[in-house]
Amino acid sequence: CVLKPTFLAASQGVLRANAPDEFSTAFRTLQEMLADPELRKRGGERAKWVLVEDYLPGREVSLEGVLTDGRLQTLALFDKPDPLTGPTFAEMLYIAPSRLPEAVQQRIRKEVEQTAQALGLTTGPVHAEARIHQGKVWMLECAARTIGGLCSRMLAFSGGMSLEALILRHALGR
């Protein structure tokens, strides 16, 4: 399984456990990490929450897009070529454009759009991460935000426009 602190970002504290003893060790590690007074001050009770998910093998991708009336416009589809198999999941490399076959890319776009609609997202930025497992697209996360950290620096649009400027222009209807 995979343990994910819900209050952290950038895959911080995301740990894989393959057996009960590994789960106990990973959970204790997270309890110590999440006991940080500064983190507790910022996050309150939520800073202690941990999500536990099944581990899903497969090739991982990330999609950046904008939604307009529920329709997805893909801005970038990134391959994550490093195998993200655990025990930690630090993402070090993104490749764009994706090298996946066009049919697979279309399935990813469709799955992201349907997931965003199911979450009630209709307008604005969307960041999604998925894995391709046994030929199927599995959503790992989908959120009404842009890619985190300094990763947006990888993207430049018409006239050198940044991702942030593009999102602001979209919000203003331009």
How should these model regions be labeled?
Residues Q106-A128, A143-R174:
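Active-site "cap" helix and flanking loop/linker of ATP-utilizing ligase/carboxylase catalytic domains
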Residues C1-A17:
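Conserved anion/nucleotide-ligand pocket segment
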Residues L15, T25-T29, L51-D54, E60-P81, ...:
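Beta-strand scaffold of nucleotide-dependent catalytic cores
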Residues L8, Y55-G58, G120-T123:
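A short catalytic or substrate-binding loop motif that flags glycine-/basic-rich loops and adjacent residues
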Residues V2-L3, P20-P57, T88-Y94, E113-A118:
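Conserved ATP-binding module of the ATP-grasp superfamily
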Residues L93-A96, A156-F157:
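Short glycine-enriched, charge-decorated loop/helix-capping segments at active-site entrances
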Residues P97-Q105:
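A short, structured beta-strand-centered segment in the mid-to-C-terminal lobe
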